[in-house]
């Protein structure tokens, strides 16, 4: 009598979890039980519980995943519709004519691309042997660091070519609210009021530590500081620090203010991982290729305004 082993184990099953992490530790044969998590290039989706841990840690580490709007669309359309804010309501006299309004004009179409963010890392075989019980948490934490830093750089400075379109992109990025030759009290105020009230309502500031240090010393004519040191706000709006924002140099855009929820991150594929045993065999290491597919765009450029430095 032959025994048939079912290799089609769902990613949310405990068996898949065990086989997946044994596979990553370099043990032979376990990939045969991961068929339902395998993609077209031979990488495997992490178990459901591990994916949840990764996503939660990535959100906690990633500034933009906290401020932006994130969608997961692995098999979705190649474009998204974004609503344009149009005031269409009007007062009508009793018995008066109500003007028809074509709501299709409310939407703009943005094409999505599958930009690949990838990392290759390697671990000594001795590390795998001696640290079996912390292996999952170590790999998860390291991937979170790698991906969160690369994502933030792309979400700020991405050009849209082989990477997302960042908020500072020349095409598709935030609108310029103020041009200035220096960061002054008045110029920061001008940037704030260059945004429409609807975007100021939930607006936040984003800048580097260097720029924040310069602003912390700004005061008005009466000596009142612009920066509220008690809660790290400017004009009542929270300040977020990103070291991927540029410094105060000619041509740079060191300060952004607005509603970052209009920056959309669309995940086309979650993180998948495959081992690279042969590549690092001679050094007694196991290599890993991990990657994700995503795109991101500022669907309403006027929602975020930036200060651009001039000579």
What is each residue range found by the language model?
Residues 82, 88-93, 130-132, 214-217, ...:
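Short helix/loop capping segments that flank catalytic or ligand/cofactor-binding pockets
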Residues 1-109:
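Assembly-associated, polar helix/coil segments characteristic of icosahedral protein shells
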Residues 80-81, 141, 201:
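Hydrophobic alpha-helical segments involved in membrane association or supramolecular assembly
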Residues 85-89, 118, 127, 149, ...:
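Short loop/turn segments at secondary-structure transitions that flank enzyme active sites
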